Amino acid sequence: MIIGIGTDILQIERLQAAYDRTNGRLAEKVLGPDEMLVFKHRLARNHKRGIAFLATRFAAKEAFSKAIGLGMHMPMTWRSLQTLNEPSGKPITSYLGALAQFMAEKNWEAHITVSDEQDMAIAHVIVTQK
Protein backbone atom coordinates (compact mmCIF):
# COMPACT_ATOMS: atom_id res chain seq x y z
CA MET A 1 0.00 0.00 0.00
CA ILE A 2 1.32 3.46 -0.90
CA ILE A 3 1.65 5.74 2.13
CA GLY A 4 2.93 8.81 0.32
CA ILE A 5 4.70 10.19 -2.73
CA GLY A 6 7.19 13.05 -2.82
CA THR A 7 9.09 14.83 -5.57
CA ASP A 8 11.65 17.60 -5.46
CA ILE A 9 13.53 19.38 -8.22
CA LEU A 10 16.15 22.08 -7.86
CA GLN A 11 18.61 24.13 -9.85
CA ILE A 12 22.13 22.91 -9.15
CA GLU A 13 23.41 26.47 -9.56
CA ARG A 14 21.33 27.62 -6.56
CA LEU A 15 22.73 24.81 -4.44
CA GLN A 16 26.26 25.68 -5.60
CA ALA A 17 25.69 29.29 -4.51
CA ALA A 18 24.50 28.14 -1.06
CA TYR A 19 27.48 25.78 -0.78
CA ASP A 20 29.86 28.62 -1.65
CA ARG A 21 28.11 31.07 0.68
CA THR A 22 28.53 28.66 3.62
CA ASN A 23 32.12 27.74 2.73
CA GLY A 24 31.07 24.12 2.28
CA ARG A 25 29.23 23.82 5.61
CA LEU A 26 26.00 23.16 3.71
CA ALA A 27 27.26 19.65 2.93
CA GLU A 28 28.01 19.00 6.61
CA LYS A 29 24.49 20.15 7.57
CA VAL A 30 22.68 18.11 4.91
CA LEU A 31 24.63 14.88 4.35
CA GLY A 32 24.75 11.84 6.60
CA PRO A 33 28.14 10.27 7.38
CA ASP A 34 28.13 7.72 4.55
CA GLU A 35 26.90 10.30 2.04
CA MET A 36 29.65 12.68 3.19
CA LEU A 37 32.34 10.12 2.38
CA VAL A 38 30.99 9.68 -1.15
CA PHE A 39 30.58 13.45 -1.59
CA LYS A 40 34.18 14.21 -0.58
CA HIS A 41 35.48 11.54 -2.93
CA ARG A 42 33.41 12.79 -5.87
CA LEU A 43 34.16 16.45 -5.16
CA ALA A 44 37.91 15.72 -5.13
CA ARG A 45 37.69 13.91 -8.48
CA ASN A 46 35.36 16.36 -10.23
CA HIS A 47 33.94 19.43 -8.50
CA LYS A 48 30.89 19.66 -10.77
CA ARG A 49 29.96 16.00 -10.20
CA GLY A 50 30.44 16.42 -6.46
CA ILE A 51 28.01 19.34 -6.36
CA ALA A 52 25.54 17.37 -8.51
CA PHE A 53 25.75 14.54 -5.94
CA LEU A 54 25.00 17.01 -3.14
CA ALA A 55 22.07 18.39 -5.14
CA THR A 56 20.51 14.97 -5.72
CA ARG A 57 20.84 14.10 -2.04
CA PHE A 58 19.30 17.44 -1.03
CA ALA A 59 16.39 16.76 -3.40
CA ALA A 60 16.05 13.21 -2.03
CA LYS A 61 15.67 14.47 1.53
CA GLU A 62 13.07 17.05 0.49
CA ALA A 63 11.12 14.45 -1.53
CA PHE A 64 11.27 11.91 1.30
CA SER A 65 10.06 14.44 3.88
CA LYS A 66 7.05 15.12 1.64
CA ALA A 67 6.35 11.41 1.12
CA ILE A 68 6.23 10.66 4.85
CA GLY A 69 4.05 13.71 5.42
CA LEU A 70 6.20 15.37 8.07
CA GLY A 71 8.29 17.87 6.20
CA MET A 72 11.56 18.65 7.98
CA HIS A 73 10.23 17.91 11.45
CA MET A 74 11.33 15.23 13.89
CA PRO A 75 12.05 12.46 13.44
CA MET A 76 13.03 13.64 9.94
CA THR A 77 16.26 15.63 9.91
CA TRP A 78 18.66 16.42 7.08
CA ARG A 79 21.27 13.92 8.23
CA SER A 80 18.91 11.13 9.36
CA LEU A 81 18.06 10.05 5.80
CA GLN A 82 20.85 8.87 3.56
CA THR A 83 20.53 7.97 -0.10
CA LEU A 84 23.24 5.47 -0.96
CA ASN A 85 23.80 3.21 -3.94
CA GLU A 86 23.86 -0.55 -4.30
CA PRO A 87 26.80 -1.93 -6.33
CA SER A 88 24.46 -1.97 -9.35
CA GLY A 89 23.97 1.79 -8.95
CA LYS A 90 20.39 1.51 -7.70
CA PRO A 91 19.69 4.21 -5.09
CA ILE A 92 18.54 2.98 -1.69
CA THR A 93 17.58 4.70 1.54
CA SER A 94 19.31 4.33 4.89
CA TYR A 95 17.85 5.75 8.10
CA LEU A 96 19.68 6.95 11.19
CA GLY A 97 18.58 7.56 14.78
CA ALA A 98 14.96 8.42 15.50
CA LEU A 99 14.02 8.18 11.81
CA ALA A 100 15.18 4.54 11.70
CA GLN A 101 12.96 3.78 14.69
CA PHE A 102 10.03 5.71 13.17
CA MET A 103 10.25 3.80 9.87
CA ALA A 104 10.54 0.45 11.68
CA GLU A 105 7.58 1.18 13.97
CA LYS A 106 5.42 2.22 11.03
CA ASN A 107 6.70 -0.77 9.01
CA TRP A 108 7.32 1.59 6.09
CA GLU A 109 9.94 1.47 3.38
CA ALA A 110 10.95 4.04 0.79
CA HIS A 111 11.61 3.54 -2.90
CA ILE A 112 13.74 6.32 -4.32
CA THR A 113 15.19 7.53 -7.57
CA VAL A 114 17.46 10.51 -8.17
CA SER A 115 18.80 12.09 -11.33
CA ASP A 116 20.67 15.15 -12.50
CA GLU A 117 21.14 16.71 -15.90
CA GLN A 118 23.33 19.76 -16.51
CA ASP A 119 21.66 22.37 -14.29
CA MET A 120 18.85 20.42 -12.59
CA ALA A 121 18.59 17.68 -9.96
CA ILE A 122 15.45 15.70 -9.16
CA ALA A 123 14.34 13.05 -6.68
CA HIS A 124 11.18 11.01 -6.48
CA VAL A 125 10.19 8.93 -3.44
CA ILE A 126 7.35 6.49 -2.86
CA VAL A 127 6.81 5.29 0.71
CA THR A 128 4.96 2.00 1.08
CA GLN A 129 3.82 -0.32 3.83
CA LYS A 130 6.13 -3.36 3.94
From Swiss-Prot:
Its cofactor is Mg(2+). Its EC number is 2.7.8.7. Mg(2+) binds at D8, E62. SUPFAM superfamilies: 4'-phosphopantetheinyl transferase (SSF56214). It comes from the Bacteria. GO terms for molecular function: holo-[acyl-carrier-protein] synthase activity; magnesium ion binding. It holds the Pfam family ACPS. The keyword Ribosomal protein does not apply. Disulfide bonds: none annotated. Coiled coil: none annotated. One of its GO terms (cellular component) is cytoplasm. One of its GO terms (biological process) is fatty acid biosynthetic process. It catalyses: apo-[ACP] + CoA = holo-[ACP] + adenosine 3',5'-bisphosphate + H(+). It is found in: Cytoplasm. Keywords: Cytoplasm, Fatty acid biosynthesis, Fatty acid metabolism, Lipid biosynthesis, Lipid metabolism, Magnesium, Metal-binding, Transferase. Transfers the 4'-phosphopantetheine moiety from coenzyme A to a Ser of acyl-carrier-protein. Belongs to the P-Pant transferase superfamily. AcpS family. This is Holo-[acyl-carrier-protein] synthase.
